[in-house]
């Protein structure tokens, strides 16, 4: 099986703010070749399931695009919107990450994660095997305070 990642990155100044954007393509040779995420189709791909259970992979499909822009709101505050898209189905994950440096040894990190897509898609919710029931994480919020000493 083959896995492949390609990335392009560019930095610039816009509106007096430092910006850095990237576009990335990821190919997962272990992913579902037919784009079906129902329990029977997934069970027929044991190589994928083993790698998911071991934490070696985090995606079900084969083709993904990711785009993000890091915006330096101030020298201490960085805001980064990111979208992860499954190219083979109409689903994506939108993530907004913020980092604020409270001092030389303290940082506050937060993110909002919003899955986008209809039921039956990777980020919208994969089929559970029960009628009209999908396995999905839903929107999420994360916060972390880090103190370095």
Identify the role of each PLM range.
Residues 12, 25-31, 71, 83-89, ...:
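Transmembrane beta-strands of outer-membrane beta-barrel pores
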Residues 1-48:
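Long, well-ordered mid-to-C-terminal structural blocks that present hydrophobic/aromatic surfaces
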Residues 51-55, 82-84, 128-133:
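Extracellular loop and loop/strand-boundary signature of outer-membrane beta-barrel proteins
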Residues 15-21, 75-79, 105-110:
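Repeated loop/turn-to-beta-strand initiation elements of outer-membrane beta-barrel proteins
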Residues 21-23, 69, 81, 98, ...:
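Membrane-embedded beta-strand positions of outer-membrane beta-barrel proteins
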Residues 112, 133-149:
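Outer-membrane beta-barrel "beta-signal"
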Residues 2-4, 61-65, 90-94, 137-141:
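Residues that define the transmembrane beta-barrel architecture of outer-membrane proteins
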Residues 1, 33-40, 83, 92-97, ...:
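Outer-membrane beta-barrel translocator domains and adjoining extracellular loop/strand segments
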């Amino acid at each position: 099986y083959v896995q492949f990642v390609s990335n392009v990155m560019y930095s610039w100044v816009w509106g007096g703010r430092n910006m850095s954007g990237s576009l990335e393509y990821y190919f997962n040779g272990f992913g579902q070749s037919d784009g079906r995420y129902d329990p029977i189709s997934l069970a027929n791909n044991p190589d994928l399931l083993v790698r998911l259970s071991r934490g070696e992979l985090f995606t079900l499909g084969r083709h993904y695009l990711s785009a993000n822009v890091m915006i330096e709101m101030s020298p201490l505050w960085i805001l980064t919107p990111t979208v992860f898209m499954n190219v083979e189905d109409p689903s994506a994950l939108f993530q907004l990450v913020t980092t604020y440096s409270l001092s030389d040894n303290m940082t506050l990190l937060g993110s909002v994660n919003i899955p986008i897509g209809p039921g039956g898609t990777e980020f919208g919710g994969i089929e559970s095997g029960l009628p009209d029931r999908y396995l999905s994480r839903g929107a999420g919020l994360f916060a972390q305070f880090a103190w370095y000493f």
